[in-house]
Amino acid sequence: MNIDPSTAPKEVKEDLKNLQTFLSQTLPAKKLDQNVLICAWNIRMFGGLTMKWESQEEDSPKRDMHSLLCIVDILRRFDIIAVQEVRGNFKCLREAMRLLGPDWSFLMTDVTKGGKGNNERLAFIFDNRKVKLSGLACEIVIPDDELEKNKAINADALQRQFARTPYAVSFQVANHTFVLLTLHVLFGKKSADREAEIQAIADWIKGWAEEMNSWNHSMITLGDFNLERGNDPTLQAFLSTGLHIPPDLDPHARTIFKKSTTYYDQISWFKNNISLQYNGGGIVDFRGNVLQNRNHTLQELSFRISDHFPLWAEFLTP
């Protein structure tokens, strides 16, 4: 059974129409040969799907056909989306790709085994009408000698740092080639205890960005960095190599629940190693703009849409 939007109940169609109006008012338009819209979205437990227009209390998972159509309408507003929390069962992803249509493609990692991996994948979804693959797709392993430079780093540092293996893919838009590196960093309860490890990882990312730049490839990192705002030592370590987080992304909440000191999702790059021109970014605050007639709590909404907002950035590509 597949989702057929034409058979959706009237209230679902009206809800989707309202969402599309909101998205048009919130996001810049996708323009061929003029811009590229990049998004990082941690979609909570993006795996199974209940094939009903509205899931009930006894249903599992809670994400239903109406919810997935909302997610797809958001996805199609971007050119490239880095998605986190794609589960081992990726029925939602398969159905989303079918709904997006033949102009869209995706790449994803294998499931990361182990408790911290949480049976999840990382994925990139992209619009083939504007975006082309340019040859590179790899899971990242940071060399041991990068960690051994600092004796304060423990032998199991990488296992603790990455819940899922970082994933890098190169894309071409117009005359610009760039690498997107998506990762999920774990810092544990005391982020200051991992400062040396984060410094080593930041140093390695900078070196790789410089290497990419020597081939006229820009590199953008995006994903769940799990950082603290302000003067937190891990944030300072990560930024110490020149990694740039756009100031206009700073004030935006990253999750639907509340503003906090955490800096979960990020889009960042090295200013000297990028050929794209940043033109602004933000979040898609879908609260109140999806599933409007259901009166869900935020917790209930998080299992149907997500607990994270889509974080986006527009780059000009003239």
List each language-model region with its residue ranges.
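Metal-dependent phosphoester-hydrolase catalytic domains
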Residues: 1-25, 90, 206-220, 227-318
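N-terminal, active-site-proximal structural segment of metallo-dependent hydrolase catalytic domains
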Residues: 1-104, 108-121, 198, 289-292, ...
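Active-site-proximal beta-strand elements of phosphoester/diester hydrolases
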Residues: 35-48, 135, 177-187
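Catalytic metal-binding/acid-base residues of hydrolase active sites
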Residues: 44, 87, 184-186, 225-228
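Extracytoplasmic/secreted cell-surface and envelope-processing proteins
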Residues: 49, 90-93, 115-118, 189-192, ...
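Metal-dependent phosphoester/phosphodiester hydrolase catalytic core
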Residues: 52, 85, 173-200
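Short, basic/hydrophobic alpha-helical segments
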Residues: 66-76, 172, 197-214
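Structured beta-strand-rich core segments of catalytic domains in phosphoester-bond hydrolases
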Residues: 82-174
